[in-house]
Regions:
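Conserved short alpha-helix immediately C-terminal to the canonical SAM/SAH-binding motif I
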Residues: 93, 117-120
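Conserved SAM-binding loop
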Residues: 12, 112-113
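Acetyl-CoA-dependent GNAT
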Residues: 3-87, 91-100, 104, 137, ...
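Conserved active-site tyrosine of GNAT-family acetyltransferases
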Residues: 124, 129, 151
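A secondary-structure capping/hinge motif
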Residues: 131-133
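Aromatic-flanked redox-active Cys/Sec active sites in thiol-based oxidoreductases
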Residues: 80, 113-114
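C-terminal "cap" of GNAT-fold acetyltransferases
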Residues: 6-7, 107, 114-118, 137-155
Length: 155
């Protein structure tokens, strides 16, 4: 399967409560320690910048969650359905989130990522994110907690 054509990328829309069953199903499929329905619901209700991407048939294939504070965006979650990974949708969703952040006046974007998520780390580095720190024991893991790499990019 090839990446969606650019015309299909116009299907980003704000995440709403009706999307949560699909979002949580993808989250549970791709992560050993997924966000809960409550995490996503709290993000929607708190007014975070939360987005979903649907393909031309209406199937939810990617989503993202970001907070915006004055001139800084904090990307909390960017995920692509397993069957659509490695097609450029993570990159395109990152570009979308950066565009949204710039529209709100953000000059920088921060995120945390697991060191074990090598493909995500590489994507963020290609985009221009730089490693600026480590949060010790940030993520749950099977035996011990996993650190988070803190990254930042100028928008």
């Amino acid at each position: 399967m090839s990446a969606l054509p650019k015309s299909e990328l116009d299907r980003y829309s704000p995440m709403v409560e009706a999307d949560l069953s699909e979002v949580v199903a993808i989250e549970a499929d791709i992560y050993p320690f997924p966000w809960t329905r409550g995490n996503f619901l709290d993000s929607v209700r708190a007014g975070y910048s939360v987005w979903v991407l649907r393909d031309r048939t209406g199937v939810l294939i990617a989503y993202s969650v970001m907070t915006l504070m004055i001139d800084e965006a904090h990307l909390l979650n960017l995920s692509v359905a397993r069957h659509c990974q490695r097609e450029g949708l993570g990159w395109r969703t990152l570009e979308w989130m950066a565009e949204v952040a710039r529209g709100y006046g953000a000059r920088t974007m921060l995120l945390e990522v697991r060191p074990s998520n090598v493909s995500a780390v590489r994507m963020y580095e290609r985009y221009g994110f730089e490693k600026i720190g480590v949060r010790r024991g940030y993520y749950p893991a099977h035996t011990e907690r996993e650190d988070a790499i803190v990254m930042r990019v100028a928008l």
